[in-house]
């Protein structure tokens, strides 16, 4: 039987963040921080306008893992995040994961993940 995953395998998931994404995420999470939902207040912030929730864009990493690599049925155990720049409505976010280690016996992988914005 061949290995489910191999070191070096990678996958990407890309999505353009929309107004609806931000509003729905605020409603689901209860995070109505003006930085996300109020353009007037957000324009006074260091970002100069509204930004998407950081965890919204981090969710694209989850989508990549759950739907592409390793794929459906994957149980996502841990993640460490660092937000390096804001994501704005209209930005396209690409989440990329790469297999760094694969333990066939335990069926566990260690993945590198990266999020880029354009």
Question: Which residues does each predicted region cover?
Answer:
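HotDog/MaoC-like acyl-thioester-processing domains
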Residues: 1-7, 87-118
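Mid-chain, well-packed structural core segment of small domains
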Residues: 67-95
């Amino acid at each position: 039987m061949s290995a489910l995953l191999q070191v070096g395998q990678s996958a990407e998931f890309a999505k353009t963040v929309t107004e609806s994404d931000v509003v729905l995420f605020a409603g689901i999470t209860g995070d109505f921080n003006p930085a996300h939902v109020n353009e007037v207040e957000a324009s006074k912030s260091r970002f100069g306008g509204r930004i998407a929730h950081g965890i919204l864009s981090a969710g694209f990493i989850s989508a990549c893992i759950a739907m592409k690599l390793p794929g459906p049925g994957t149980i996502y155990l841990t993640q460490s995040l660092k937000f390096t720049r804001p994501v704005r409505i209209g930005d396209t976010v690409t989440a990329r994961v790469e297999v760094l280690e694969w333990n066939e016996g335990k069926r566990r992988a260690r993945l590198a993940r990266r999020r880029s914005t354009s």
